[in-house]
């Protein structure tokens, strides 16, 4: 039975990796594929077994990262030890989260385990020196933007442009009426319930982000309500994971 270990560090990685796992499940030769590691609800819905909570890795900023550092280092050590011994996979796939995944990939590659990384770190924008560690840790980089492969070619790192996993889910010409109907269906509302101005409020996908900036978002919502009196306003707040619903409702 083929084994794939993968790690997504936050909801965005979970969202990106789920279509990949779905595609693998449709390949006849991959029947019986065992997928495990760290992932969110979307990856788990595709049959992945998450052995550690993804929320441990979902931190924002230096202060939060420092506070969580002992737990993150402990988790990474446990993960590496597991994957080098009883949970040894045929392939390791790191999804984004380079600060965590590159360290794991480096140790696994040294042990002879093929390593792939989905979503290139933004070395073309900042911290270009990371290419050296990437070349040591990653056997093949899976790029979501076409221009990134040229950077890896020059550095002698194998790469493949795979496209953005979510590109096919976002229409080039959005149908506003259809979108409203889908929202009403999802929230079990009458179609007339969303007449007026609909405003999406996106306070983030990490608990630390929400704790820091959600109050500002709610103040802004109140300000808009006061300034746009007479207009029918609807504020929609998508929740990245079930655990984030409670702090937002509070």
Feature map (PLM): residue ranges:
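Conserved catalytic-core segment of nucleotide-activated headgroup transferases in glycan assembly
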Residues: 16, 206-238
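Short beta-strand segments at enzyme active-site cores
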Residues: 94, 199, 236-238
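Catalytic donor nucleotide-activated moiety binding site of glycosyltransferases and closely related
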Residues: 233-250
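Charged active-site motifs of nucleotide-sugar-dependent glycosyltransferases
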Residues: 2-3, 191-200, 233-234
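Active-site and donor-binding regions of nucleotide-sugar-utilizing enzymes
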Residues: 2-187, 202-210, 223
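Short, solvent-exposed coil/turn linker segments
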Residues: 53, 190-193, 244
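Long, highly charged amphipathic alpha-helices
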Residues: 19, 23, 216-219, 247
